[in-house]
Amino acid sequence: MLSFISLVLSLSYLPLIITIYQQAHYHIKEYLNYFIRHFYLELLILMVYLIYFISGYNSLIMAFLILVYLLYLYSKLRIKLKFTKRIIRLFIILIPFLYINSYLCISYLFIFILCIPFFISNLIERKISHYYLKKAILKRKEFNHDVIGITGSFAKTTTKYFMSQILDDITPLATKASYNTLNGISLELNNHNLKYYNALILEMGSNHINDIKKLTSAFFPNIAVVTGIGPMHLDSFKNISNIIKEKMSIIDGLGEKGIAILNYDNEYLRNYSYNGTSYLISYGKNADFSYQILEDYVNIYAYNEFVFKFKNNGYDEIDISNMMPGIILGVLYKIDYNQMIFRLENIKRPASRQRILEIGNSIIIDDSFNSNLKGALKALEQLKHYNKKKIIITPGFVECKKLLPNLYLKYAKRINEICDYAYIVKLSTSKILYDLIKINHSYVRSVDEARLMLSFNNEAVLIENDVPDIYL
């Protein structure tokens, strides 16, 4: 009976555990950190076995209650388990461990025991990933058109998304969503017949030193765009100098025929001493390619010469900055200006990046994918223009822990000046922000919980930096 209870509890626990592991991007360390923060779950499991030994079959009732509770916890997860091929392979590896666990009745240690099959799974997945990476590298070598690599501490996905629209005439293939790792880019290249495309636009992300070098060594772009540098992922990079070195490594392998496109509105890039042999093009308010934002139009200049203008449909400096790499390449590719103007005036934003949704007489600004101060302040400025009750839902920021006090001083100041109410999603790092908020505010467990509290009666709601369950 004890082994049966153990098996049932293990099976009911499994969806929750595997989902958290998936949200941790299959990193065992992040997975363990989550459950160490939520260790009360394991204590409940232990309680079942203590009651069993004391009262025998009466523990079935308690086991049933725990089972229901575990399934309830899974139902409360905002991001549910996605049954990918990797997850299916993982479940196959887990089968013998479930049997061993039920036989030995060690559910109390189940979370930690699962690290063994996770480790085995990761070894297998590395072999599989290496196979598909080699396949993608071969396809890249056979591709005879431009490969554009986009990196930076922020705005990579938006810049890529804008660029693919501006350059539509040359039929580019852009990696979808935020696919910016070796596996993500390999998946995109392997899923498409590259003979139908005349350019590749590859977003290249980096959370650790040498991530960019691995990407450029595999897909060797001949055009590199750096959107900006800031204190992101400081927990892994340690200091801003390492971030600059990492991001700028994208231009190291370009060669004499390569093109490096840098955002000179960014202080770190503007002050960077470039000693490479590639052709350098800067963009910004005062750069090789510059812009002038007027009330009705945006003027574009190349080396102080007027190029064209397009209608300003509510664009601000960050929007135009994110458009500039696409505009530069459009000019270099000699795309018809009228076509570029039409696309710029009708450009679409990527999902969850300041998308505006209307619900009755209320609006929601969905900026849930943003995770940096600059973008958050921009979204607050957008919120300011609505003559409605202004509400922000935010957890703050989940990285740059050393800089959080300074970041939150600036963030809270604008929230207090602009908003009428703030819902703070409770994280381990959110108390600093919570204490700095002077307007009416309250804690919530998730963005979804805050949504349920909205009246949608003449409200303007900003959802800023939603986070997965792994951070909660």
Over which residues does each language-model region extend?
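ATP-dependent carboxylate-amine ligase
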Residues: 1-102, 108-125, 277, 331-338, ...
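A conserved, hydrophobic alpha-helical segment in the catalytic core
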Residues: 114, 218-231, 270-273, 306-349, ...
